[in-house]
């Protein structure tokens, strides 16, 4: 428990975003859409790229794994694990750059497929991977 508290305190000093190491948050993030349930060390909801870098640096300095997480819709357990979960879906969910002529887009990691395709649709484009979930 003391190690978890020290890790949470170090993350709170390092990031501007949310740091959640409470039992309820850990319970909510222990599952995805699969049958697996593994309690995370805690959760960081980064506000920006600097928060992501800071969280990874704190984790590395403390020997903790980091697991990026989107919507938690994995059907095979990729988004659960005994790690610090980085949930970018709240603040880092925008289209950053789009070039219609060259047909490319740069997005933040929390943007979901349906939102990307809604952005691209007026330009007659679609990002076509067929994933199990897209919202």
Whereabouts are the PLM-identified features?
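N-terminal accessory segments
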Residues: 1-33, 58-66
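N-terminal glycine-rich flavin-associated loop
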Residues: 11, 34-66, 88-133
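A glycine-rich phosphate-binding loop feature that marks nucleotide/adenosyl-phosphate handling sites
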Residues: 25, 75-77, 134-135
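Short glycine-biased active-site loop of nucleotidyltransferases that positions the nucleotide triphosphate
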Residues: 33-35, 75-80
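Conserved PLP cofactor-binding pocket of PLP-dependent enzymes
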Residues: 69
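Short acidic, glycine/serine/threonine-rich loops at helix termini
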Residues: 77-82, 117-119
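Short glycine-aspartate micro-motif
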Residues: 85
């Amino acid at each position: 428990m003391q190690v978890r508290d020290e890790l949470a305190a170090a993350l709170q000093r390092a990031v501007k975003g949310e740091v959640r190491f409470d039992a309820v948050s850990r319970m909510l993030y222990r599952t995805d859409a699969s049958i697996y349930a593994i309690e995370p060390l805690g959760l960081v909801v980064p506000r920006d790229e600097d928060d992501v870098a800071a969280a990874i640096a704190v984790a590395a300095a403390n020997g903790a794994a980091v697991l990026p997480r989107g919507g938690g819709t994995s059907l095979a357990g990729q988004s659960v694990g005994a790690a610090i979960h980085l949930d970018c879906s709240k603040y880092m969910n925008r289209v950053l750059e789009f070039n219609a002529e060259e047909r490319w887009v740069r997005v933040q990691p929390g943007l979901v497929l349906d939102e990307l395709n809604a952005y691209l649709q007026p330009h007659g484009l679609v990002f076509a991977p067929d994933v199990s979930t897209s919202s």
